[in-house]
Amino acid sequence: MTMLRLLTLTTAMVLLGGCSPGGTGTPTTSPAISHKSVELTAAVPTARIPVDPVRDAKALRISIISIDNKAQQGIQLNVSIRREGGVAVPVGTAGPFPVDHPSELRLPLTPAMAEVALGPRPEVMVELASALPEQPLNPQITLTVAAAITA
């Protein structure tokens, strides 16, 4: 494993406070993951996921429901949040670990981000990217992703 890849994975783990494969993340008292999931690929790397507004939002939960990453390329999701008619506010970057396992990721929200999460019609914007900027995404990678705002 290259030093840059190890550093990228370590940074992601610190930002997330850890992540756990198989959807066994930290339990929350929040609403369920959005009933709408999206598929991300190298050909269609970005998507918007409508989520329910949550008062006193503390985090954004991203569920990687399924993942096909046979090449085991290091990948990340660039995540932002916006409300109807608003500008996207970056939330953070996270990725699955191991890189070919479904995962539950949790990104903390600042008070300014939480205000955006109150709506109207908030949505999470996700972008699939290579963990190493100089390496293009493998065209065979496919992720199915859902999201929820948590209190």
Regions found by a protein language model. Name each.
Residues 70-78:
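Short coil-to-beta strand junction motifs in C2/discoidin
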Residues 59-62, 67, 129-151:
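Exposed low-complexity, polar/acidic, P/S/T/G-rich flexible segments that act as propeptides
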Residues 39-63:
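Contiguous beta-strand segments within globular domains
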Residues 98-123, 131-137:
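Short, surface-exposed tryptophan/glycine-enriched loops
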Residues 1-8:
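Bacterial N-terminal signal peptides that target proteins for export
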Residues 28-38, 87-102:
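Solvent-exposed serine/threonine-rich low-complexity stretches and specific carbohydrate-binding patches
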Residues 15-18:
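C-terminal motif of bacterial Sec signal peptides marking the signal peptidase cleavage site
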Residues 20-22:
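Bacterial signal peptide processing site
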